[in-house]
Amino acid sequence: MSTRTATQPALTPKQFELVAKALADPRRMALLEAIGSEREYACSKLCRVFPLSKGTVSHHMKELMNAGLIQSRKEGQFMHFEIRREVLAAYSAELMRRVVRTD
């Protein structure tokens, strides 16, 4: 019996690996937690809140986007990020499927 719902897409093995690698970095995890604490989070605010250079923040945002964990929206000259909850849910479900015995 599948526990996946219509709003919870399956991740390909490559997507699962990208998410796992993205979440393994403590700085990316901290950035993701900050973004998740608000509906949207401005890139400029991330640069103020975290003791990281703009280039480092940009690199980590690109990795999180490549993994599908966040999406961006440009408003004028400002970039805003938000969590893609459906990807986190799919990753969590796949992780449970892989590591927890269900019988």
Where are the model-predicted features located?
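Extended rod-forming repeat segments used as scaffolds/tethers
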Residues: 32, 66-67
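Short, hydrophobic-biased segments on the C-terminal half of alpha helices
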Residues: 61-62
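N-terminal helix-turn-helix DNA-binding core of bacterial DNA-binding proteins
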Residues: 14-53, 75-87
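Amphipathic alpha-helical dimerization/coiled-coil segments
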Residues: 1-16, 33-37, 84-103
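Alpha-helical residues within the helix-turn-helix
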Residues: 48, 65-66
